[in-house]
Amino acid sequence: MTALDIQISVEAGDWPPEDELQSFCERVLEAAADFLAREENQPLPAQAAELSLVFTDDQSIRAINAEWRGQDKATNVLSFPAFPVTPGRMPGPMLGDIVVAHETLRREAAELEKPFDAHLTHLLVHGFLHLFGYDHIEDDEAERMEGLETRILARLGLSDPYGDQPPH
C-alpha cells in the first residue's frame, strides 16, 4: 500500500467520531493512491504524501465555495491541490485539502438511495483525484475521471456511481 499522512478535522456537522472517520478515510484513500500508482503509473513522493480532510456543514462549505470558486451555494466536496499538478506527474509532498459537507452528502445519498458511507467513499475518491490534477470540466476529462472513480470504487466493492452496474 502507498503511504499517506492524512490529517482530519471535524469542524461542523453530525459526523462519526474522529477515530472512526480517520480509519475509514485511510482505508479509502490508501486504496485510491495504490490504484493510481499501480494502474495509472502515478508517481508518488518517497515520503508519505500529506493531505488534510475537513468535515464540515453546508453553511461552512457554502462560504468556502463562494470565496474560492465564486459560487454562493453549498456543494458536496471541494478540493484544493497544494501545488498545480498534471495527472501522471510527481505531486509535491503536500497533496492538498479536501472539504466535505455533511448535509449535502446525506441528502445526495438519500436521493441516490445509496448508503452514507458509500457516497462518502465516492466523494473522497472524487476529491482525491482532483488533488492529482484530474478534472471534469471538459467531456473527455470527465469521462477519464469518472472511469477512474468507477474502477477505484469497484476495488473497494462499490458499484458504479454513474450507472446501475454492479462492480466487476
Curated annotation (Swiss-Prot):
Its main location: cytoplasm. InterPro entries: MetalPrtase_cat_dom_sf_prd, YbeY, YbeY_CS. It comes from the Bacteria. Its EC number is 3.1.-.-. GO terms for molecular function: metalloendopeptidase activity; RNA endonuclease activity; zinc ion binding. Zn(2+) binds at residues 126, 130, 136. Binds 1 zinc ion. Its cofactor is Zn(2+). GO terms for cellular component: cytoplasm. HAMAP family: Endoribonucl_YbeY. This is Endoribonuclease YbeY. The gene is ybeY.
